[in-house]
Regions:
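Expand to "…catalyze enediolate/carbanion chemistry for C-C bond making/breaking, isomerization
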Residues: 1-114
Length: 114
């Protein structure tokens, strides 16, 4: 039995499985299409989008995350708080993963992982 086709490829995950290092482009302020194009053309695998210290317009963030995926990049987002609702919002917006920078307890991290 074969596996079902992947609907959205996670390039960073594929690179990691191959044993190669993931090349990351950190995006702090400018969520512009040109950033995605430059990162993609230079061969980056992943965009790490900073949302912990920067407030981005939700529509702009969603467009940026989808554009990253459409250009073969894995958008990963830092999250400011350890809430399931916050993580769900970012994943629904198009992030393929998240970086939880400040879990206060192991229970918070476990709750997010569930």
């Amino acid at each position: 039995m074969t596996s079902p086709p992947v609907l959205i490829e996670n390039r960073a995950k594929s690179v990691l499985k191959s044993g190669d290092p993931i090349i990351v482009f950190n995006v702090f302020e400018s969520l512009r299409p040109s950033v995605v194009k430059i990162a993609s053309q230079l061969g980056f695998d992943m965009l790490l989008v900073e949302t912990e210290h920067m407030q981005h317009n939700p529509e702009t963030l969603t467009s940026f995350l989808v554009m990253a995926r459409d250009n073969g990049l894995s958008p990963i987002v830092t999250i400011p708080t350890a809430t399931r609702a916050g993580v769900a919002r970012l994943l629904d917006a198009g992030a393929l993963g998240f970086c939880l920078c400040h879990a206060e307890t192991s229970e918070q991290a476990d709750d997010i992982a569930r």
